[in-house]
């Protein structure tokens, strides 16, 4: 640069580091917390997904942030290949502080289903062990409420692990887990759809979240089965010549599947309700989440991605609903 000075000069940031650490360690937000799920209350909870490397204004990350705020430590995520696996697991940074693992496009649904079966096997072993002690009040409390998060959390603290070393190795499974299969529309509508269909056909309590950008985002912008009629993208400039696959309607062909279509930019409370309903529903569930993307070419810029998402539902382009078979 001019005068021999560098255009970018690195300086010490120790003073700000101390201030930042103070804010993290002296977090008093929890006292404002409430079991009532609203946008305000949920914002006071410390998320288990922070500082990702996603694009500025990414429409996917708010869904994941709120997912971790709702389910906290009992959340387990199986993530498909795509944008969410890149900003979710790029070395050396890792934005999650809950169990998270990534698999391929074509087998992530089966991968997540396998994790759920592994968790259930561990919990069945705990159940079998506790049944051998019918007079133990703590064990009886767990056996009668083994799917109740709050009560199981109490039991977790009350168990004498010195007397029962067998449970010490499996204590992480005493509290029930909320299992989520997460991926984009490339995974859910296209490459991994066969796995999605297989999981939805079962009766297990498993949840699927589709981060629907309506385009192959991570690979630079190609049309997917989620792209709408006439939609253009960087590598599909001629426009799509057929219609968007109606994944929600297909899922509802199974009468036992919980289905929701959400747009956090339009109504965050509706999304939060869908999360709780899906997790508490005793069966498979799928939530399709409209996610504005840098590949959409929003003229006002990605800082307006959420207001753009609001308009998508306001004009009827993306419909939101919750369908609960129960």
Q: How should each PLM-predicted stretch be described?
A:
Residues 1-6, 11-13, 78-80, 182-183, ...:
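Generic beta-strand/beta-sheet core signal
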Residues 22-34, 95-104, 223-245, 303-320:
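Acidic, Ser/Thr-rich peripheral helices and adjacent loops at domain boundaries
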């Amino acid at each position: 640069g001019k005068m021999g000075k560098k255009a970018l000069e690195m300086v010490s940031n120790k003073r700000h580091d101390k201030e930042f650490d103070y804010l993290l360690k002296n977090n008093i937000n929890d006292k404002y917390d409430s079991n009532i799920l609203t946008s305000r209350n949920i914002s006071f909870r410390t998320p288990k997904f922070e500082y990702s490397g996603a694009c500025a204004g990414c429409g996917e990350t708010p869904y994941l942030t709120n997912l971790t705020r709702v389910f906290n430590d009992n959340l387990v995520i199986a993530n498909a290949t795509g944008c969410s696996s890149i900003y979710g697991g790029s070395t050396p940074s890792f934005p999650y502080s809950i169990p998270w693992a990534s698999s391929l496009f074509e087998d992530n649904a089966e991968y997540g289903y396998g994790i759920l079966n592994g968790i259930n096997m561990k919990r069945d072993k705990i159940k079998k062990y506790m049944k051998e002690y019918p007079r133990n009040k703590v064990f009886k409390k767990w056996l009668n409420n083994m799917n109740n998060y709050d009560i199981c959390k109490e039991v977790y603290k009350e168990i004498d692990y010195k007397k029962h070393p067998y449970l010490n190795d499996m204590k992480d499974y005493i509290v029930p887990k909320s299992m989520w299969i997460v991926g984009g529309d490339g995974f859910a509508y296209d490459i991994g759809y066969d796995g999605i269909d297989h999981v939805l056909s079962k009766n297990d309590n498993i949840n699927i979240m589709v981060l629907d950008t309506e385009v192959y985002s991570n690979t630079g912008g190609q049309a997917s089965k989620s792209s709408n009629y006439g939609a253009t993208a960087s590598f599909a400039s001629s426009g799509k010549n057929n219609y968007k696959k109606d994944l929600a309607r297909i899922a509802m062909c199974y009468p036992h599947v919980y289905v929701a279509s959400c747009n956090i930019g339009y109504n965050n409370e509706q999304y939060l309700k869908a999360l709780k309903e899906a997790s508490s529903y005793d069966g498979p569930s799928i939530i399709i989440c409209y996610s504005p993307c840098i590949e959409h070419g929003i003229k006002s810029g990605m800082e307006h991605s959420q207001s753009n998402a609001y308009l998508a539902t306001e004009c009827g382009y993306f419909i939101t609903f919750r369908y609960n078979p129960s």
